[in-house]
């Protein structure tokens, strides 16, 4: 299946490094971007979540990765960046394009891409200021395993409408958990 043009453009731009540096007022811009993405995810709802209660699943969101006091700003930004990349990948699958309205999906890609761009610019500034490891390997693994469980769930449920609705609601929940980044 051919990828939507906006997805291809986002992938091309993602592969290029930003030559300009954005101001790192991340908590404000990140919050606004999250609000836009959450609104889009809300608009993507096609069926009532109540009709899918039998399909509920605990994907084991690694909340400890996003607890603000545990990490310094670069590690928190890196964790959120990995999460957004995984969400982008999840909604870029063939099964996803068949499940959602293409216009809303394109807007979601754009919103996620904007988030990634802001995080990358901010991360490069933060790492330049202090030489700290970007993300604890255990945290990175926890985020990736979480999304692997979601992908496996979708596969086991044969990408059914209810499975996608459960995943959409889960992504909204986990995405909103990552909105509060440390200020320093």
Curated annotation (Swiss-Prot):
InterPro entries: 4_helix_cytokine-like_core (IPR009079), Interferon_alpha/beta/delta (IPR000471). One of its GO terms (molecular function) is cytokine activity. One of its GO terms (biological process) is B cell activation involved in immune response. The keyword Magnesium does not apply. The keyword Iron-sulfur does not apply. Disulfide bonds join 24-122, 52-162. GO terms for cellular component: extracellular space. It is found in: Secreted. Pfam families: Interferon (PF00143). Keywords: Antiviral defense, Cytokine, Disulfide bond, Secreted, Signal. Residues 1-23 form the signal peptide. Produced by macrophages, IFN-alpha have antiviral activities. Interferon stimulates the production of two enzymes: a protein kinase and an oligoadenylate synthetase. This is Interferon alpha-3. It comes from Equus caballus.
């Amino acid at each position: 299946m051919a990828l939507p043009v906006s997805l291809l453009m986002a992938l091309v731009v993602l592969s290029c490094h930003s030559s300009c540096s954005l101001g790192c007022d991340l908590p404000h811009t990140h919050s606004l971007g999250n609000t836009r993405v959450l609104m889009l995810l809300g608009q993507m709802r096609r069926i009532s979540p109540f009709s899918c209660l039998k399909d509920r699943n605990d994907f084991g969101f690694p909340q400890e990765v996003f607890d603000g006091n545990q990490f310094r700003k670069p590690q928190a930004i890196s964790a959120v960046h990995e999460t957004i990349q995984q969400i982008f990948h999840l909604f870029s699958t063939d099964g996803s394009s068949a499940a959602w309205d293409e216009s809303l999906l394109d807007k979601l890609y754009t919103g996620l891409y904007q988030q990634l761009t802001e995080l990358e610019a901010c991360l490069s500034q933060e790492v330049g200021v202090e030489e700290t490891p970007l993300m604890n390997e255990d945290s990175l693994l926890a985020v990736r395993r979480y999304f692997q469980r979601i992908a496996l769930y979708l596969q086991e449920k044969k990408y059914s409408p209810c499975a996608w609705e459960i995943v959409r609601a889960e992504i909204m929940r986990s995405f909103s958990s990552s909105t509060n980044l440390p200020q320093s």
